[in-house]
């Protein structure tokens, strides 16, 4: 994670989540979460847990967006109910609250959110004690689009009687657990529109008229009973978040190998003795890796930890004001028209804002810890309990009982040096190695035939800077989106009042802010405009 690496996706798939108090004083406690099946009727009011003082405040659900018959036709189905979809719900509410029409007859649009998690949660696995947000609270789910919205972070504070006290903190960066609580407060207004424990498996054309698709079918598996249910909608928005990514050298699955997205709630279950001398290997060079490396040492004072990374050293993130402008909403308009080569060069040049970088304060604290070990134990790092192992790569992992044998090789100019080998023993390996954001490709497989033919593949295309190539029986096709995030199907194949939109997987065309929180408020307004058009 970098200063902007507050991603929008929901990567956790567990049915238990940590209780998020805003004091962040201890490791998260595990609590059981009730499942929300398709047949559960939403109450008129909902209650959310306010982490500041454990008060429960009633939340009135949105009166502008009403629940529709699940067997009917929806105007919009959102796949995923994380921050991206939540911001769209807020934009819809605000548009209607302002007296504008989204349907010709002025009625409320029929909207449905399908979410595989048991309830709304944002990065539950990385809500660490003391962790701060890395973007300003002004870039919340509403302010940059409409500062008067009910759903601003400042109004959340006001509703919970903390606005003055928060002001006295003199910061733009709230605690991460408080910001997650803010988003859960927002989501509580729309719980009646969400079907949790529903994992979407496919989106297919459902109704055609003269070879033009008028309606799509969304198939979702109920994770409680395993049944597959079909929902129908004119417009479909895919906002599925990222899938945890592991290095190729890692076993396919092992109970003592975790992804950083599982950290906060899985580690206490595996490493149960706070005083034990556990050996933990953390893999990665970004903010999440550094935070976990730091946090393990605090939680388990007798542990030994190794931070293994291909980079030579931890690098600070660049969050200077001029560089920060690439996360401004208007920068998307400057980037999208560029050539594939221009966008590719931009992504490489801007990596220091978002990938493989760490906040300077944390780097300085970790360096101080490494220095203290050197001062007390001497220069031989192999005698230190905590090591940052740069220019290293894990080549192999072998299970040995309850432990893992980790074979590490040094890198020379990016190439593995077989002579530089070290074997570590680990009770736990945590991979802070990012996410894959390509679930939409297979999810839309049944629509590939409607895509235009692809120009012979180039290296640029593989980076997603112009889209994605897919192989069909009729040859290679091009899956790409327009400036409004709408999938570009062949002319006439999809009706003008129907379509599919992508969120959180368009970094190659729309910039580094695409997977982040930075532009959600303004982008959601654009999405509503694109899907529902101007006021009727």
UniProtKB/Swiss-Prot annotation:
Pfam families: Lys_Orn_oxgnase. Its cofactor is FAD. FAD binds at residues 115-123, 134, 200, 515-517. Keywords: FAD, Flavoprotein, Monooxygenase, NADP, Nucleotide-binding, Oxidoreductase, Virulence. It catalyses: L-ornithine + NADH + O2 = N(5)-hydroxy-L-ornithine + NAD(+) + H2O; L-ornithine + NADPH + O2 = N(5)-hydroxy-L-ornithine + NADP(+) + H2O. GO terms for biological process: biosynthetic process; intracellular iron ion homeostasis. Residues 1-25 are annotated as: Disordered. InterPro entries: FAD/NAD-bd_sf, Lys/Orn_oxygenase. Homotetramer. This is L-ornithine N(5)-monooxygenase SIDA. It comes from Beauveria bassiana (strain ARSEF 2860) (White muscardine disease fungus).
